[in-house]
Structure formats: C-alpha cells, structure tokens
Amino acid sequence: WSQNTGPAVADYMLYKSLVFAAQNLDSETFKKYKASFLECVNKQKSPSILVFLTAEVPYLQNQIKKRGRSYEQNIEDAYLKKIEIGYKKILETELPFLVLKIDAATYDFKESEQGFQHLLRKIYSAKFL
C-alpha cells in the first residue's frame, strides 16, 4: 500500500474507529482518543475512493443474525441507529478521498455475479482516476 503510486479503492475507513469510540467511551476518554487518532490518521496514505455500503437497520439486523456471532446477537436497533448517525456525520465532513455510497440491500455482492459486476461498474464509472 505504501509503495502504490496509482489510484487505490478502499472498502474500509479508518474514521470508523471514531464512530464506535464516540458510542463506547466516556466524553473525556473520547476526546483523548480522538486527538491521538487524528494525529495518527493524518500520517496515513488515503485511498482515491472509498466504497461505503449503506443499509437500513432491519437489513443490518438480518445480516447480523446470518453471520451468527454470539456476541452480536443482542445488538439493539438504537445502537445501530447511533452508529449510522455517526457515519453520516463523518461522511458530511471534508474527507481526503471520494466516497461512493452503495445501498447494500440492493445487490448481493457476495453471492451474485450480477451484483458484483454492478458494484465494479459503479466503482469504475466514479470520477476518481
């Protein structure tokens, strides 16, 4: 990654750590975490584009159940909604990369070749090159 000089596509956003930290840390600890996080993230190379999958809470709950991780089974809708709001706040800020939002419920990228091809077309047609 550090050697790459061309465009890079990411499906993971370091900033997501801030979203979860805001929900799980007390305000004083979060302030310290955020300051340290921003210092570190500013040293990282940014992707050219971030593929950000969006989904409504019922879809997320269904995916959580399908994944079957015992520690996730009791996640409440309200918590997922707070996480969604946190993501929206970050995505509304000026980020150093293009964000391509894709509704995860529209296409099955994992099981459907057609869905996967649709995702690839969206990425390649984005203006990030």
Report the location of each language-model feature.
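Conserved nucleotide-sensing/catalytic segment adjacent to the nucleotide-binding pocket
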Residues: 1-7, 12-14, 20-28
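Short, flexible, glycine/charge-rich loop motifs used to bind or transfer phosphoryl groups or to couple energy/partner
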Residues: 3, 39-42, 90-91
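Short amphipathic alpha-helical segments, especially helix-boundary/capping motifs
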Residues: 10-15, 60-65, 96-99
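Short loop/turn segments at strand-loop or loop-helix junctions that form parts
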Residues: 10-15, 54-55, 103-105
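A glycine- and Lys/Arg-enriched "phosphate-lid" helix/loop adjacent to the NTP-binding pocket
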Residues: 17-86
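NTP-dependent small-molecule kinase module
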Residues: 65-73, 78-129
